[in-house]
């Protein structure tokens, strides 16, 4: 998930001769890619909860219901199908109790800014956490090192680069 990045930034009609998609272009042409997508809310964190947990109650992660697993959680669906579930985020783990809450909802791991900083000491801190580059490095490393018969991976990422202040 790319916070605040409209897909128009990936289209030649918008960018002209500058191909911002780069190596992603081949995936845009061959993978499952939704060109028309509306957020569930006008806030990234609220939309995130709606998409991953399938609830409109966006404050649930720090409410009295925070420890109740929901059958509608996307991660639980993938876990039941045998996947290892991982959430990688350059933001801080404690934001709205996301780290602990997403684990309750079926994510095996929640990797946030603190874990990324420990793994990638060159990562600089920002007001929202770290740098998205290291989210992608972590995912790439996971995919490169993944071998059978290990369970397949379901990895969700959330970027923060486009969040003000830039």
Regions found by a protein language model. Give the residues of each.
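Solvent-exposed soluble domains appended to multi-pass membrane proteins
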Residues: 1-166
């Amino acid at each position: 998930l790319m916070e605040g990045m409209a897909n128009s930034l990936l289209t030649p009609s918008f960018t002209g001769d500058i191909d911002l998609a780069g190596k992603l272009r081949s995936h845009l042409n061959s993978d499952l890619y939704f060109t028309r997508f509306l957020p569930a809310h006008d806030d990234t964190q609220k939309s995130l909860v709606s998409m991953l947990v399938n609830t409109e109650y966006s404050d649930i992660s720090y409410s009295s219901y925070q420890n109740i697993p929901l059958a509608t959680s996307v991660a639980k669906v993938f876990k039941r199908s045998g996947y290892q579930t991982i959430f990688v985020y350059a933001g801080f783990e404690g934001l709205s109790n996301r780290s602990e809450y997403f684990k309750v909802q079926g994510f095996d791991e929640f990797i946030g800014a603190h874990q990324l900083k420990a793994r990638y000491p060159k990562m600089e801190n920002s007001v929202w956490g770290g740098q998205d580059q290291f989210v992608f490095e972590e995912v790439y490393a996971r995919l490169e090192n993944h071998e059978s018969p290990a369970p397949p991976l379901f990895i969700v990422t959330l970027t923060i680069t486009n969040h003000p202040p830039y």
